[in-house]
């Protein structure tokens, strides 16, 4: 199975399955000299872990990270960093009844079509538990970027058809962790929570939109034509399980605008080139303009629902019905926020190294 490596100069390789012994990541390309600890990684993993609120799966995992290599006396050595998280609360027997009946909306059928075999326990490699490795690697990318004044924040912009009001980067940063749905607008967050609770009672689920903003990005990041910054962001975010759409800046709204409305006029401010608006989302021609990066992903409803659905029995080759049991999130966006932030951080760490803004060997001077 290929496709487990992401990045060029700052690379991660994730490994493990939902109900295997452990999941983890190997990070390669982090320059020597970056101070970090398990606590820095754990802080991000705690935001992603299950069982943290009423809008997440009740699966109880501590998701405690162990750093196995690449660190000495509290600093990166420039060698590969391997991190591991043990799986401790897997209940594989819950999935035995659906071993031969692919779940609608899941990768069950397509994994069989591709490989001829699949780990049916919790989705195996296709489970969102794989994103633990992404978040751990992204935590290091965030730390690296913070040394260069680059900050990243994500939030739930929309959930179950309820949309938050427009907020600034600082407002989102200050308020996003104050609600279980990770929406920085308190009024919208309350309605979102009520909607998800009602859907959960019905045995159904809700989708939504996660927005990620990046502040402090220098102008000049990106490698046209095929490694455009926005193209790499799209690939990174579209690789997250359950993501079905991506947009940057005005996004699909740009299709309904005039050129005079869409174009961001240039102007001088404190001796620097800036723009009067940011419909381009901070990227022009695949290269960062120095404005904030603003991108969004559409997240589908959790496909694991207890409502009766139609499927097939791959053993008898007949039509069948399925009602999925087990412990599942009633909505995905709140726990996707740290995953989306991590993938964006990985893209920017990679491009900062590729574009020469960061010394690829050492931060020690």
UniProtKB/Swiss-Prot annotation:
- Region (Disordered) residue ranges read 41-62
Record-level GO cellular component terms: cytosol
| GO terms for MF | chorismate synthase activity; FMN binding
Catalysed reaction(s) here are: 5-O-(1-carboxyvinyl)-3-phosphoshikimate = chorismate + phosphate
Q: Which InterPro entries match?
A: Chorismate_synth (IPR000453), Chorismate_synth_AroC_sf (IPR035904), Chorismate_synthase_CS (IPR020541)
Biological or metabolic pathway of the protein: Metabolic intermediate biosynthesis; chorismate biosynthesis; chorismate from D-erythrose 4-phosphate and phosphoenolpyruvate: step 7/7
EC identifiers of the protein: 4.2.3.5
Q: What class of enzyme is it?
A: lyase
Where is FMN bound in this sequence? 125-127, 285, 300-304, 327
Q: SUPFAM superfamilies recorded for this chain?
A: Chorismate synthase, AroC
- Locate the residues binding NADP(+): 48
Spell out the family assignment given in the record's similarity comment.
Belongs to the chorismate synthase family.
In its UniProt entry, what is this protein called?
Answer: Chorismate synthase
Q: Which organism is it from?
A: Methanosarcina mazei (strain ATCC BAA-159 / DSM 3647 / Goe1 / Go1 / JCM 11833 / OCM 88) (Methanosarcina frisia)
């Amino acid at each position: 199975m290929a496709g487990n490596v992401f990045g060029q100069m700052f690379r991660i390789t994730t490994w493990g399955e939902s109900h295997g012994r452990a999941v983890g990541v190997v990070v390669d390309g982090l320059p020597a000299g970056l101070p970090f600890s398990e606590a820095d990684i754990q802080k991000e993993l705690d935001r992603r872990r299950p069982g943290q609120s009423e809008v997440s799966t009740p699966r109880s995992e501590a998701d405690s990270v162990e750093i196995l290599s690449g660190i000495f006396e509290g600093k990166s050595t420039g060698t590969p960093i391997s991190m591991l998280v043990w799986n401790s609360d897997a209940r594989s027997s819950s999935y035995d009844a659906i071993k031969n009946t692919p779940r609608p909306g899941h990768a069950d059928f397509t994994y069989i079509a591709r490989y001829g075999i699949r780990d049916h326990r919790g989705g195996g490699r296709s489970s969102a538990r794989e994103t633990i490795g992404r978040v751990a690697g992204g935590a290091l990318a965030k730390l690296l970027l913070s040394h260069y004044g680059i900050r990243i924040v994500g939030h739930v912009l929309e959930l179950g058809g309820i949309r938050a009001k427009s907020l600034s980067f600082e407002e989102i940063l200050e308020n996003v962790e104050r609600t279980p749905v990770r929406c920085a607008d308190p009024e919208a967050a309350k309605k979102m929570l009520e909607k998800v609770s009602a859907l959960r009672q019905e045995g159904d689920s809700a989708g939504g939109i996660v927005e990620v903003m990046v502040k402090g990005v220098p102008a000049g990041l990106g490698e046209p034509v095929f490694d455009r910054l926005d193209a790499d962001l799209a690939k990174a975010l579209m690789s997250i399980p359950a993501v079905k759409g991506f947009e940057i800046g005005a996004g699909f709204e740009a299709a309904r605008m005039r050129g005079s409305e869409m174009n961001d006029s240039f102007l001088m401010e404190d001796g620097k080139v800036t723009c009067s608006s940011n419909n381009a989302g901070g990227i022009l021609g695949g290269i960062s303009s120095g404005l904030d990066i603003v991108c969004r992903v559409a997240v589908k409803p959790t496909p694991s629902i207890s409502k009766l659905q139609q499927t097939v029995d791959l053993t008898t080759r007949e039509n069948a019905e399925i009602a999925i049991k087990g412990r599942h999130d009633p909505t995905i966006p709140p726990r996707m926020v740290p995953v989306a932030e991590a993938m964006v951080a990985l893209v920017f760490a990679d491009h900062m190294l590729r574009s020469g803004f960061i010394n690829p060997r050492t931060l020690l001077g």
